[in-house]
UniProtKB/Swiss-Prot annotation:
One of its GO terms (cellular component) is ribonucleoprotein complex. Part of the 50S ribosomal subunit. Signal peptide: none annotated. Keywords: Ribonucleoprotein, Ribosomal protein, RNA-binding, rRNA-binding. Gene3D superfamilies: 2.30.30.30. One of two assembly initiator proteins, it binds directly to the 5'-end of the 23S rRNA, where it nucleates assembly of the 50S subunit. One of the proteins that surrounds the polypeptide exit tunnel on the outside of the subunit. It comes from the Bacteria. Belongs to the universal ribosomal protein uL24 family. It comes from Escherichia coli O6:H1 (strain CFT073 / ATCC 700928 / UPEC). PROSITE patterns: RIBOSOMAL_L24 (PS01108). One of its GO terms (molecular function) is rRNA binding. HAMAP family: Ribosomal_uL24_B. InterPro entries: KOW, Rib_uL2_dom2, Ribosomal_uL24, Ribosomal_uL24_CS, Ribosomal_uL24_KOW, Translation_prot_SH3-like_sf. This is Large ribosomal subunit protein uL24.
Length: 104
């Protein structure tokens, strides 16, 4: 099945502590999760690695979030939207369901 949400899409979080926040998808994982810039930040306690000259400490990084908890953001309507698929000139393309506008 084709992916409805892909890398570099702007998404909006639907549920959880970051509900309503928007961000850009950095990575889509095969486990049905996505990593979004600035969303679901967690603190990781990292040990120093002297061989790589890396200091230790507490590092903030983005954790994965379920793809079902995000929706693609439609810039023309300013709201979250659903994604559909259709064929244009023999190619399968994604489109917004609310206004039938093709995505990128």
């Amino acid at each position: 099945m084709a992916a409805k949400i892909r890398r570099d899409d702007e998404v909006i979080v639907l549920t959880g502590k970051d509900k309503g926040k928007r961000g850009k998808v950095k990575n889509v994982l095969s486990s049905g999760k996505v990593i979004v810039e600035g969303i679901n930040l967690v603190k990781k306690h990292q040990k120093p690695v002297p061989a790589l000259n890396q200091p230790g400490g507490i590092v903030e990084k983005e954790a994965a979030i379920q793809v079902s908890n995000v929706a693609i953001f439609n810039a023309t309507t300013g709201k979250a939207d659903r994604v559909g698929f259709r064929f244009e000139d023999g190619k399968k393309v994604r489109f917004f369901k609310s206004n039938s506008e093709t995505i990128k």
